[in-house]
């Protein structure tokens, strides 16, 4: 009689957007960043697979996809992150979707970029 292996299910335990990752932990976590931030990090903790797979961090500014970063997941508990350079005129609403290899959105994180005066600048984020 063979052993039946239960199918692994990926679960995003934690998703953070911040200004750095130091010693494999996020730094500068917030939901609002100044347009002068430069680079942001999306940090995720993923559980549920003992097998090697990938997830993607898909960065959106409004409805414009700004980046799609594929990341390896190689253990039951895995920490990984991606980075995105933020241009100063990219103010407004943002989100990062964590997407499985089969295209399922596992979790999303929303945040906002504001101008250095604390005001939002009107930017058309519906088209390229």
What is each of the regions a protein language model found here?
Residues 40-47:
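Short edge beta-strand/loop segments characteristic of extracellular beta-sandwich folds
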Residues 52, 89-93:
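Extracellular Ig-like/FN3 beta-sandwich strand-entry sites
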Residues 57-61, 98:
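Conserved aromatic beta-strand anchor motif in extracellular beta-sandwich/beta-rich domains
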Residues 72-74, 111-116:
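Short beta-strand edge segments in extracellular beta-sheet folds
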Residues 74-83:
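Aromatic sugar-binding surface patches on proteins
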Residues 92-101:
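Short, aromatic- and glycine-rich surface loops/edge beta-strands on solvent-exposed regions
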């Amino acid at each position: 009689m063979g052993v039946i292996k239960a199918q692994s299910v990926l679960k995003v335990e934690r998703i953070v957007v911040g200004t750095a990752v130091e010693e494999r932990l996020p730094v500068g976590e917030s939901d609002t960043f100044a347009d002068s931030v430069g680079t942001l990090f999306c940090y995720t903790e993923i559980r549920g697979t003992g097998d090697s797979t990938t997830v993607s961090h898909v960065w959106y500014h409004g409805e414009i996809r700004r980046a799609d970063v594929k990341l390896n997941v190689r253990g039951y508990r895995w920490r990984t992150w991606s980075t995105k350079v933020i241009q100063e005129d990219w103010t407004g609403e943002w989100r990062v979707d964590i997407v499985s290899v089969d295209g399922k959105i596992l979790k999303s994180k929303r945040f906002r970029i504001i101008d250095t005066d604390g005001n939002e600048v009107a930017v058309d984020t519906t088209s390229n």
